């Protein structure tokens, strides 16, 4: 209760960052809707984007803190992704009689991109809850924590792409000019990562049972994607 009172002391009455709304949510009081809700949300997104030095540094610190005493650091995720891709690629290429030289790079890239999607959804469901203390102490736009999350997932995505580059060097699949679509597609991934993380973050902050439900659904959804069922792409 004292934390909430302290928060109220640092949140101005004309706050446009949404910090006051989240403080009320943590206190258990549902935020009151008003005619400026969308304007305040847009203002928060803009102000959060302008605080790029803050969320870039926080995202980088998240990775350093998580793997502080690890020899390989975040590359453990890269290794795990590579092993998973190799196992799934070999298994499903045999089951579905797919060409391994095409299917294995396909599964590898799919797993890497799915890791980004799943990270934005699952971590997004916890983005405000996990940063509750920082939100109460730091008078910054709430979107800073969302940008921080997406930036962190982008860093994971970047070094996981090493696996795919290795697959390209080994199997040399024909990509053609369509391969250039990766860059606009990546931009769409980043934009969608922001709103998805913010959406699930808001819902999970109000309804705490949403986060574990989201975790289960994300794991289930993986097996419903064209990453594994390559035959769907040929239809």
Show the residue positions of the predicted features.
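Hydrophobic transmembrane alpha-helices and immediately adjacent juxtamembrane helices
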Residues: 1-233
């Amino acid at each position: 209760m004292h934390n909430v009172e302290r928060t109220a002391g640092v949140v101005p009455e004309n706050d446009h960052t949404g910090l006051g709304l989240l403080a009320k949510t943590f206190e258990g009081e549902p935020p009151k809707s008003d005619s400026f809700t969308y304007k305040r949300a847009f203002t928060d997104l803009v102000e959060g984007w302008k605080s790029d030095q803050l969320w870039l540094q926080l995202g980088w610190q998240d990775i350093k803190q998580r793997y502080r005493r690890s020899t390989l650091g975040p590359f453990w995720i890269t290794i795990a992704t590579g092993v998973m891709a190799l196992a799934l690629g070999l298994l499903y290429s045999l089951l579905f009689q797919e060409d391994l030289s095409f299917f294995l790079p396909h599964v590898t890239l799919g797993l890497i991109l799915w890791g980004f999607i799943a990270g934005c959804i699952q971590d997004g469901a916890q983005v405000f809850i996990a940063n509750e203390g920082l939100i109460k102490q730091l008078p910054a736009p709430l979107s800073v924590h969302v940008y921080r999350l997406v930036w962190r997932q982008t860093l994971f995505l970047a070094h996981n792409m090493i696996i795919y580059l290795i697959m390209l060097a080994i199997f040399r699949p024909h990509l053609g000019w369509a391969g250039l679509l990766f860059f606009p597609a990546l931009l769409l991934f980043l934009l969608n990562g922001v709103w998805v993380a913010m959406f699930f973050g808001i819902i999970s902050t109000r309804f705490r049972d949403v986060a574990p439900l989201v975790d289960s659904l994300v794991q289930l959804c993986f097996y419903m994607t064209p990453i594994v069922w390559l035959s769907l792409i040929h239809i």
